[in-house]
Design a protein with these regions (language model features):
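Short acidic, Pro/Gly- and aromatic-enriched capping/linker segments at domain boundaries
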Residues: 1-8, 236-237, 242
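A short, structured loop/turn motif at beta-sheet edges
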Residues: 8-13, 40-51, 78-83, 112, ...
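Extended, loop-rich substrate-binding clefts of extracytoplasmic carbohydrate-active enzymes
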Residues: 18-81
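Acidic, contiguous internal or C-terminal segments within carbohydrate-active enzymes
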Residues: 55-106, 111-113
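Surface-exposed, gly/pro-biased binding rims or lids
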Residues: 57-62, 66-67, 118-119, 126-136, ...
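Active-site/ligand-binding surface loops and adjacent short beta/alpha elements
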Residues: 97, 107-201
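Active-site pocket scaffolds in enzymes
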Residues: 194-266
Length: 266
């Protein structure tokens, strides 16, 4: 979200269309998910299958009048015994700075295990601070200590459905999986012990959790490289996560879904 559609970069101010109506009056979600991306490569072998897509953003895109910064977006999806991996690359093709605040509206079905029950789902999100949001779902710039409600995420006790999780936004940190460092979230079916693990690269510094009022059989642990409205905040960039890509440079992130099954006793 960008308040009032304004995006303040270091070298320009862009006015994006407001597509989140009053009382919010924000620009939300961007436009890339509404574009047809070209498949430029696909193949499969005994180890994996992959597909690579590309979208070239330039003056031919109707959004260019709002954000006249040329770039290329490339997505590579790889499916193997290591899980489902997504590599994202944004290359700045312009002669000005490319504002970068990347997020995924990741959605997980509930239940996610055959025969599972929604009430058995537990979500672990490694977090350190709560990012307070106002009534327009914009940061107040206050980072708050975790309450008992918030600690349910950190301690793996949060059921992310059957109750409202409405834009719970946090500063992320590195957690643990099987004794190793793990930068991501873990959804577990407590009845079976089966885990769905969602690993993200270190560029993703924040998490926001949303579940569409909790009764629609899905939940969204959404990784973000920057806070909501990050370029417009007065906080330092090392706090907000906002960054800019120089002309000719590339910004790259990585995500991976994989499963963990409970150990089988012999």
């Amino acid at each position: 979200r960008f308040a009032n559609g304004v995006l303040r970069a270091s070298d320009a101010v862009y006015n994006l269309p407001i597509n989140e109506a009053a009382p919010y009056n924000n620009h939300i979600h961007g436009f890339l998910h509404k574009r047809a991306h070209e498949v430029i490569e696909h193949d499969a072998d005994n180890n994996c299958a992959w597909v690579k897509t590309r979208y070239v953003y330039d003056e031919n895109d109707e959004f260019f009048s709002y954000l006249p910064v040329k770039f290329t977006a490339e997505y590579t999806f790889t499916l193997s015994e290591q899980g489902l991996e997504l590599n994202v690359r944004f290359t700045n093709n312009s002669d000005v700075m490319l504002p970068m605040s990347l997020a995924s509206h990741t959605t997980i079905n509930a239940p996610f295990v055959d025969g599972g029950k929604e009430e058995d789902i537990r979500l672990t999100v490694p977090i350190s601070k709560k990012c307070e949001l106002n009534d327009r779902c914009l940061p107040t710039e206050r980072l708050k200590s975790l309450t008992m409600y918030d600690l349910e995420y950190k301690n793996g006790a949060k059921c992310p459905v059957l109750q409202v999780c409405d834009n719970d936004m946090y500063v992320g940190e590195t957690g643990e999986l099987d004794g190793d460092n793990f930068h991501g979230v873990i959804a577990e079916d407590a009845a079976s012990g089966k885990k769905l693990c969602y690993e993200v690269s270190d560029e993703y510094k924040f998490w926001i959790i949303w579940n569409d009022r909790g009764m629609n059989h899905y939940f969204c642990p959404e990784p973000m490289t920057a806070m909501i409205d990050a370029p417009n905040l007065s906080l330092e960039r090392d706090v907000t996560g906002y960054t800019e890509v120089k002309p000719g440079d590339t910004f790259e992130t990585h995500q991976r879904f994989f499963t963990k099954l409970p150990a089988v006793e012999e």
